[in-house]
Amino acid sequence: MKQLLLSALTSCALVLLLMLRPVTTLAQVPNRAPVPAEAYKVSAEVDTMQGWHRGGAGTLNFSQVSLSNWAAGGQSSLSLLAIGNAYTHYKEGVHSFDAAADLVYGLLKPGKSRLRKNDDRLELNSRYGRQFTNVLSYAAQLNLKTQLTPTTDIEKPDSLLSRFFAPAFILASVGIEYKPTERFSLFLSPATGKFTIVGDQTLADAGAFGVRAARRGPDGLPIAGTGERLREEMGAYLNARLRQPIMENVTYQSRLELFSNYFHNPQNVDVNWENLLDFKINKFFSANVAATLVYDDDILVPIRHTDQPDTRGKRIQFKETLGLGLTYKF
């Protein structure tokens, strides 16, 4: 296994050297036009002298339900969802660099129950590319996903489920990007490192998010502090992105990520599929429908049972949100 890992890392190094070494023929490749503002979620501020494109947006979605003597039943509720994103893009000759940050945080107050979190996501992305044809580039990407605040079980408030960097998922990959238009891109990497970090020792001891659980002593009980806090994987990775206007002021965006571990059940592919349907009402108001599907063969999720104790198992995870609110672009 170590020899396979060494071979994969060597392949990564060779691809990087190929990306960075000077190649005179590449100078003949026509420069791809600067990425227009429409290719991003938000409008961009362009510095034509330096080749930089920068932009971002903040959205605040709000919903409220109030019931009083409502015969059909139901529950009053109040929810707030904050969404922020920012990006920068640089292009000069055959070289390009992209960086982006996305933050989502939501709060829910159902009836007289305590305030709880219903969404929490922090994602950072960076990419370097070196173009060698009109539609193909060597590329290196780095992705980080985690959350900001602790998450506890609704029925057991003292039971911690996750927190900042517990987990954190890091993908480091090198490969080839195919980009025929500014609306679509496909990145394929045969050498990608996936790192799962569980920064909380209690969660690590429980084997949460696929890390190795704590060892057990002679009495059969877990030995505290022996759970591993890092899981390392090497495999193939695919990232496909699409941004397609459907009609005036209506845009569909999709991102599909697939990862296959070379050394452990490679047929069980990890899936992360994000979809967004965005409706622009006017300059400041917008509505959107978002749906995310996730499957990770190494992550066990809680399974509730009515007639027997709760268990944990592999499941397809799905999240859908509908929002209407204020949007500020910069």
Model-derived regions: residue spans:
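Outer-membrane beta-barrel translocator domains and adjoining extracellular loop/strand segments
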Residues: S68-A72, G111-L115, T151-P157, V198-D205, ...
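Transmembrane beta-strands of outer-membrane beta-barrel pores
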Residues: L60-S66, E92-V94, L103-K109, L144-P150, ...
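Cleavable N-terminal export/targeting peptides
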Residues: M1-D47
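Repeated loop/turn-to-beta-strand initiation elements of outer-membrane beta-barrel proteins
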Residues: H95-F97, V135-Y138, R183-L186, N249-Y252, ...
